[in-house]
Amino acid sequence: MKKDISIAPVPGRKWTIGIRYGSRIEQLRILPVKAVRITNEKHDSVMLSNPDCAPWCRTRLKMLVTSECTAGYALQPGSLVLKDAGGRMFEPGKDYEINEEYGTFMRTADGRIREGEPVFASYSFFHSRLDSIVLAEDGVIVQRLGDEDMATPAPPPVQPGEKLLANIYFSGHPDRISGDMIFPVLTNRLPVSPSQTELMPETVAKLKSGKKVRILVWGDSVTECSYLPEKEHYQTMFLKRLRSAYPKADIEMRTLGWGGRSTTTFLNEPPGSPYNFMEQVVAWEPDLVVSEFVNDGGYSPEMCEECYGTILDAFRGNGIEWLILTPHYIKLSWMGLTSQKNCSEDPRYLVRFLRKFGKENRIAVADGSLKYGHLWENGIPFMSYMVNTINHPDRRGMKLFADALIEAMTEN
């Protein structure tokens, strides 16, 4: 890991960073993301206040819309103004409720916004952006601007002769640069999952011999992945690489994903349900089940033991091998994190449990979490991979899963 670079905010200067690179010490003024002002954006109607409605599912400011949700913290606080067609201003807290984190709002039951009445919204917001600090070919350290995006900004390409030193992540509405926005590039590698072919002997033997192999990929919305093209699903990438690694392989792969659900949900589904565990997972008679459940992340130790123990008993009793994919990193507050840096150790009990459970029971574990936890060392904030700014990875995040799976399934 590189130790010859240090970048930090300069005290007393809102948008200036101090750079130590080798024997060089200098300062660089950073160009921040500018607010965008929207005037009189028409909304044909406003949802009635409902405390059970998720904050990102309410009436959405249109410029903040991402995949399925709205961009968290993109709205400039205090900037929203709602008016009727005649220009009369509505009062927040009285006529409507606003969630400034997600840029959504609802009309109150006793307010002046009527059912079906159009309203006109004016507000300011910020795009996300991932810039690069590079050592240019002429020896000058410069800021390269990335493309602005509401959810998944990508860093600019590094030109021939340039050296990438760090990335700067603009997200939300910062009023000055902070250390948490600066991602020095400490390495260009991610941890590799060890080969675990010995824990899936029957499946691997069939892959090598050309006998028919049935693989069931089982999970939640990340596995269902209705928000991305099929070619960008992790299991599609995994299948392509599996066939390349085992040229004789005859693979039948099926996906069973259910958005917003967990292992417990599947286990509790009644007979006849298209998501009943015994009928739709076990009875399909797969040789191998690949499981991914980020939605199990809030499970207690007792729930982990009960659910995963039940699944293991069913698989072992029916000759099914298992490859557990540890979950990706998600919205910081949902993980108990305060920064996307120095987060190599996943704080979720579920991940620690799955690693231990795999070792104790000789179950293969592909460690997707481990790769996400080290993105910061590569200069990448993991939230820049989330298309909904919460928990749905883009194609780059899906590739990390495919990497972890193929590493576990091959002799690396």
Can you annotate each of these PLM segments?
Residues 268-285, 305-310:
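Short, well-structured alpha-helical segments in soluble
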Residues 156, 168-210:
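Non-catalytic propeptide/linker segments at domain boundaries
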Residues 261, 275-278, 291-305, 324, ...:
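Serine-dependent acyl-ester chemistry module
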Residues 191-257, 276-285:
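Serine-esterase "nucleophile elbow" of acetyl-processing enzymes
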Residues 192-199, 329-412:
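Catalytic His-Asp segment of secreted/periplasmic serine-dependent ester chemistry enzymes
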